[in-house]
Amino acid sequence: MIRNVIIGLLAVAVIATGYWGFQEQQQSQILTVQAENGYQRAFHELAYHIDQIEDQLGATMAMNTRRQLTPSLAEVWRLTSLASEEIGQLPLGIVDLSKTEEFLHHLGTFSYKTSIRDLDKEPLTDEEYEKLEKFHDYSKTIKNDLRKTQAMTLKKDMRWLDLNKEFQAQDEPLDNAIVDGFRTMDEHVKGASEVEWGPGMVIRNDHEKKLEKRLEKRKITEEEAKEIALSYVDMEQATDVIVSETGDGLDMYSVIIDDPERQAHYYLDMTQQGGHPIWFLQERQINEQNISLNEASNKAQEFLEEHDKENMQLVDSKQYDSIGVFEFVYLEDNVRVYPDTIKVEVALDEGDIIGYEAMSYLVNHHDRDLEEPELTADEARERLNPRLEVMEDHIALIQNDLGEEVLCYEFFGVINDETYRIYINAEDGEEEKVEKMQEAEPVYDFD
């Protein structure tokens, strides 16, 4: 009898274990499909919005009245913002798109500042029309390069997650149609950096110029750069560490570390002034998930504290296959300081830090004298759409469209099952920014 009971219990345990394994595998497949869907959506929407930018710029050059020019330039600015966001959503850390991003920044700044100007009193100058023509020419180049890359990916049925795996497994420079297409695009738009865009439209990357002003004067040595890099990747010593100086732009050290024990490579850039790591990436095979997203977020927080990044609050977390991506902002007197942002990636198989990006934090972090808000949270809430069901609120410092820091109330709310983040100016009650929060891509099962 006891024997039968034991056999029965073992059978139930085996079935339960099998069911749990099936559930885990199914959940992993769902996350994988969601991640791939997100990448595909961002890529094709990027191509679509670049198309629209080129068309809108072409139409703008033919206009001659403020009634048409102002909304047209505002639309260019809106599309440019969308395109920049979509580039940021793609897993392109292995490709340098700095020139393309710089071009979009210049175009966005020009179109925004021009659209809010009284064009009846201060019409576009001949010089500004020349800039529009150059913007149009470069946007056409980007559009054509993107279309070629898009056609190639559709023809070969290429997947973005395969690109990530290919990158992790590579020993030589990655040879991939997607990567080659984006490299070609960035190479073609390099000429845009040689154009003098006028006041406020600097050739050097704005972030790099601001960062250079904030950094300590003393430059570290290559040996010091090596020691700092090893501490960030949690290694005391390595058999092979290559430190080299970067070329144009901000003076930086690029560090490559070989870790035979983990079968991994590390890539890291840091400033020569002060030795501040800007980003690093660990390249290795990521295996099945062993730790939860919550455990990974704690490891990311501990990593920041170990490297003197105190008072950082987790504001967003996402999971892509077996990788957790976490966004932290600096917290000052209970105010979320969004310009001071750091992103950390954690491998969910071993719980180690595999990615770090701190450019925004390094550029913007400084001592601030935050003023008390003029409005209360309840007064700010009255400025919201009455149909919005508010779920949570915070006090936050953000950058407006002109790059100015503004103290706001941050509200998360729902309308018709859609989640929004809305910023209300804490001084005058104006609506500073409205963002629709991203949702997980749907997974369709036709089996």
From Swiss-Prot:
<comment type="similarity">
    <text>Belongs to the YpeB family.</text>
</comment>
<comment type="function">
    <text>Required for spore cortex hydrolysis during germination. Appears to be required for either expression, localization, activation or function of SleB.</text>
</comment>
<dbReference type="Pfam" id="PF03413">
    <property type="entry name" value="PepSY"/>
</dbReference>
<dbReference type="InterPro" id="IPR025711">
    <property type="entry name" value="PepSY"/>
</dbReference>
<keyword id="KW-0749">Sporulation</keyword>
<dbReference type="GO" id="GO:0030435">
    <property type="term" value="P:sporulation resulting in formation of a cellular spore"/>
</dbReference>
<dbReference type="InterPro" id="IPR048402">
    <property type="entry name" value="YpeB_N"/>
</dbReference>
<protein>
    <recommendedName>
        <fullName>Sporulation protein YpeB</fullName>
    </recommendedName>
</protein>
<keyword id="KW-0309">Germination</keyword>
<dbReference type="Pfam" id="PF14620">
    <property type="entry name" value="YPEB_PepSY1-2"/>
</dbReference>
<dbReference type="GO" id="GO:0009847">
    <property type="term" value="P:spore germination"/>
</dbReference>
<dbReference type="InterPro" id="IPR014239">
    <property type="entry name" value="YpeB_PepSY1-2"/>
</dbReference>
<dbReference type="Pfam" id="PF20769">
    <property type="entry name" value="YPEB_N"/>
</dbReference>
